[in-house]
């Protein structure tokens, strides 16, 4: 019995998603496979990918430009949330998955499909992100996961595709698995599976090495309005152009490389290489502006919730209730995050050297140690007495207990 009649397949042009097309038809009895490839600013020429799907047996091969919503609806909220999974990874790949899932569901409705499919394997994070997102948006649609179920090794998958005339894009010279979009690149597999092997320079494309970076530093000014980046060096840019320019500037100075051991959703550790120059630069600038414009208790609370926000997105819960609630809190905090931050880029580093805001909570007359100081130093004694009272009472009780044995 056929698993489904008409399926919309998330398609990248890679080995797994290409093999999914004949596999769905010949092994699972699917009558019609419609593929969808998302343009997320990865820079690939998508016409060959579209044709490749047709050659593999797809009845329709669709390509959609999702760059603008990717930045405005997914990347910019992540910047506001200072989203860094495990304190480092800015979710460049994870942010794309709920958007692709949403578009898959929309296409399925438009063409009358009874299922959607993806080529994610059973060890990765993306299977979780797609399955959970689709289940939230369209619980009536089946989600077919051939790569998770077919039980073939990488070599066997390639051989299966060759039976149906599919060429393999992976050679011995380039054994890496690469995912890319406008926000960055993720690189894994091959020699990188040994966590003690230094990544060769050939795996990087968006950033130069620190050795090849300019000897002279460059100052960059980033402007924000309500927590959203709006300008670079005084020039207002649309969201997509701003990300491109941030990538260019940071990448040209070797900033934005990550080499980390990451805890996947499925419980294993993986070694990941990331290039995310612009996104990391913007998050760093945004964090600094918040330190100037948010009250201390709000800032501390937000820093705690940012980690949870990043965990939720990484774990595929973009459309979940907790993230929705956190979005409301973050939105409220951003009303006063207005101003600019100056950052010095130099040979792999990005150092904040200045920040300014009309909503600044920094009061020079209170902070100065000069003659203009308006802080009432005499008030400190009473404050410290009350502040330290609980500690003194606890210490006294501890001494009494010790005295009586």
Curated annotation (Swiss-Prot):
Cite the binding residues for L-aspartate: 121, 125-126
Cysteines engaged in disulfide bonds, as pairs: none
Question: Residues that bind L-citrulline, according to the entry?
Answer: 89, 125, 129, 177, 186, 262, 274
The protein's annotated catalytic reaction(s) are: L-citrulline + L-aspartate + ATP = 2-(N(omega)-L-arginino)succinate + AMP + diphosphate + H(+)
Looking up CDD domains in the UniProt record yields: ASS
Single Gene Ontology BP term?
Answer: argininosuccinate metabolic process
The GO terms this record gives for MF are:
argininosuccinate synthase activity; ATP binding
Provide one Gene Ontology cellular component: cytoplasm
Q: What is its EC number?
A: 6.3.4.5
Q: Per its record, how is this protein called by name?
A: Argininosuccinate synthase
What broad taxonomic lineage does this protein's source fall under?
Answer: Bacteria, Bacillati, Cyanobacteriota, Cyanophyceae, Synechococcales
Q: Which gene encodes it?
A: argG
């Amino acid at each position: 019995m056929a698993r489904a009649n008409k399926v919309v397949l998330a398609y990248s042009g890679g080995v797994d998603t290409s093999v999914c097309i004949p596999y769905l038809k010949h092994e699972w009895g699917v009558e019609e496979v419609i593929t969808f490839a998302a343009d997320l600013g990865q820079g690939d020429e998508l016409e060959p990918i579209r044709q490749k799907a047709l050659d593999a047996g797809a009845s329709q091969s669709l390509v959609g430009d999702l760059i603008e919503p990717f930045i405005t609806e997914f990347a910019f909220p992540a910047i506001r949330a200072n989203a860094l999974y495990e304190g480092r990874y800015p979710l460049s790949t994870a942010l794309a998955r709920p958007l692709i899932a949403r578009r898959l569901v929309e296409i399925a409705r438009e063409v009358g499909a009874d299922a959607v499919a993806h080529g994610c394997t059973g060890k990765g994070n993306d299977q979780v992100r797609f399955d959970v997102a689709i289940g939230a948006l369209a619980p009536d649609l089946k989600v077919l996961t051939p790569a998770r179920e077919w039980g073939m090794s990488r070599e066997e998958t390639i051989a299966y595709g060759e039976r149906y005339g599919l060429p393999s894009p992976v050679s011995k010279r380039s054994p890496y698995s690469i995912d890319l979009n406008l926000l960055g690149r993720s690189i894994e597999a091959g020699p990188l599976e040994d966590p003690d092997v230094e990544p060769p320079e050939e795996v990087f494309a968006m950033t130069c090495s620190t050795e090849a970076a300019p000897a002279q530093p460059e100052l960059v000014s980033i402007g924000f309005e309500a927590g959203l980046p709006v300008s670079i060096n005084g020039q207002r840019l649309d969201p997509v152009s701003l990300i491109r320019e941030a990538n260019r500037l940071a990448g040209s100075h070797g900033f934005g490389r990550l080499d980390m051991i990451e805890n996947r959703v499925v419980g294993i550790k993986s070694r990941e290489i990331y290039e995310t120059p612009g996104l990391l630069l913007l998050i760093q600038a945004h964090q600094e502006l918040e330190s100037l414009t948010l009250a201390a208790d709000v800032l501390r609370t937000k820093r705690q919730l940012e980690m949870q926000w990043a965990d939720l997105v990484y774990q595929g819960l973009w459309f979940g209730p907790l993230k929705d609630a956190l979005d409301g809190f973050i939105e409220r905090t951003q009303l006063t995050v207005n101003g600019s931050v100056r950052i010095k880029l130099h040979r792999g580093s990005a150092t904040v050297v200045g920040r300014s805001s009309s909503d600044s909570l920094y009061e020079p007359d209170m902070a100065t140690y000069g003659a203009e100081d308006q802080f009432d130093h005499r008030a400190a004694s009473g404050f410290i007495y009350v502040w330290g009272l609980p500690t003194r009472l606890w210490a006294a009780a501890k001494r009494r207990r010790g005295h009586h044995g």
